[in-house]
């Protein structure tokens, strides 16, 4: 199904589930582990014997993993690690007018990673969140993910958890997992920040606990905007649109093109799909860029002749695929993260990197302050009514 005009809003309204999620959070806060056992049995239809996966349990599950999948995980791990190691910032120091100053970077000490699960498990999500956290030297990493129908940990997830060296894995999912990581229970450690994607209940829970714990963001359904000119292959464009539609019925997929023939050929390949695709004919590529920057999509593909030049004009996008690069490869092995901002949040932040797990601490050492700076600091303190601030400064340097 094709629409030739963009909707006013994208689907990301979790207000309808807020009352239910509030009750879940309150239950976990008051009943702790008992609530987690009850909710897992009620919502996931699984009875678990223990919340925290035992070390032997993880090893046993990991041993069941197909060797080809192990190799794929190992290969992806090295590529993602190389990308995030490139981003580690140095400590910086300098000075001006008698004052030494600088920034030192420190890791967040404890984080929680939520890994969704359903018909399939998503070990790539644990790689995407866990690798930058490890590169950032986070001391304690705790993972929560729904249990399998057998009440244990998915083999691929267990393998990645062992490879990353995470501290603990919890066999809990949904809003109750977010609440447990935010407030702690008898079995679940309380963390300082929670990252990872999830359904509307998970997002609502992250929103509700964000006053007591850091979060990476509130995310909606997957988004893809494609800007394509006459050099693009319709087959690739259509495949990429259909690929992102696999994420669910609410995915937001847009083709912006100034080429009538390309649009016609793409239409032929997607017109019978039940999924809604948006196709917009633009006057030129500059108009396409303007629309894309307003949308601020999670994924942006530039199927154009000079992709690097066009990329210089993009200011709002979670991740950009250049030329014939399929967005799907970013979901796995390209290097950039697949945990990306949606619903316009790319206007103010990007995907998960080491910067989500470190924080800058600024310092100053005042030695031989010049008279102008000294007088300025005392005058400003007095003007704002902080008289003793001024005296504290003056006592040392006047």
Curated annotation (Swiss-Prot):
It catalyses: L-histidinol + 2 NAD(+) + H2O = L-histidine + 2 NADH + 3 H(+). GO terms for molecular function: histidinol dehydrogenase activity; NAD binding; zinc ion binding. GO terms for cellular component: cytoplasm. Binds 1 zinc ion per subunit. NAD(+) binds at residues 114, 176, 199. Its EC number is 1.1.1.23. Keywords: Amino-acid biosynthesis, Histidine biosynthesis, Metal-binding, NAD, Oxidoreductase, Zinc. Belongs to the histidinol dehydrogenase family. This is Histidinol dehydrogenase. It comes from Saccharolobus solfataricus (strain ATCC 35092 / DSM 1617 / JCM 11322 / P2) (Sulfolobus solfataricus).
């Amino acid at each position: 199904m094709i629409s030739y005009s963009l909707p006013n809003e994208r689907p990301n309204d979790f207000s309808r589930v807020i009352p239910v999620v509030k009750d879940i959070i309150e239950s976990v806060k008051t009943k702790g582990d008992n609530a987690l056992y009850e909710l897992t049995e009620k919502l996931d239809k699984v009875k678990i014997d223990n919340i925290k996966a035992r070390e032997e349990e993880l090893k046993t599950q990991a041993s069941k993993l197909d060797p080809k999948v192990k190799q794929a995980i190992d290969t992806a791990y090295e590529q993602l690690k190389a990308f995030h190691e490139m981003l580690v910032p140095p400590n910086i120091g300098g000075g001006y007018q008698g004052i030494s100053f600088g920034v030192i970077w420190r890791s967040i000490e404890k984080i929680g990673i939520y890994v969704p699960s359903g018909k399939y498990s998503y070990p790539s999500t644990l790689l995407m969140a866990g690798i930058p956290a490890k590169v950032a030297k986070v001391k304690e990493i705790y993972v929560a993910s729904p249990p399998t129908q057998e009440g244990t940990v998915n083999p691929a997830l267990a393998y990645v958890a062992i490879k990353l060296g995470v501290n603990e894995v919890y066999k809990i999912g949904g809003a109750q997992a977010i609440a447990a990581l935010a407030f702690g229970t008898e079995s679940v450690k309380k963390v300082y920040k929670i990252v990872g994607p999830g359904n509307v209940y998970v997002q609502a829970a992250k929103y509700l606990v964000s006053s007591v714990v850091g979060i990476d963001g509130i995310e909606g359904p997957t988004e893809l905007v494609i800007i394509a000119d006459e050099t693009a292959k319709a087959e690739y464009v259509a495949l990429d649109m259909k690929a992102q539609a696999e994420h669910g019925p609410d995915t937001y997929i847009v083709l912006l093109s100034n080429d009538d023939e390309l649009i016609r050929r793409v239409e032929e390949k997607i017109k019978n799909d039940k999924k809604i695709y948006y196709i917009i004919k633009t006057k030129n590529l500059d108009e396409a860029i303007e629309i894309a920057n307003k949308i601020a999509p999670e994924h942006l593909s530039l199927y154009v002749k000079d992709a690097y030049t066009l990329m210089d004009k993009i200011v709002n996008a979670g991740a950009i695929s250049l030329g014939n690069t399929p967005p799907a490869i970013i979901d796995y092995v390209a290097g950039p993260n697949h945990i990306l901002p949606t619903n316009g949040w790319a206007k103010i932040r990007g995907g998960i990197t080491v910067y989500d797990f470190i924080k800058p601490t600024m310092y100053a050492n005042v030695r031989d302050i010049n008279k102008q700076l000294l007088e300025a600091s005392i005058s400003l303190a007095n003007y704002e009514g902080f008289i003793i601030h001024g005296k504290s400064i003056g006592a040392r340097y006047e």
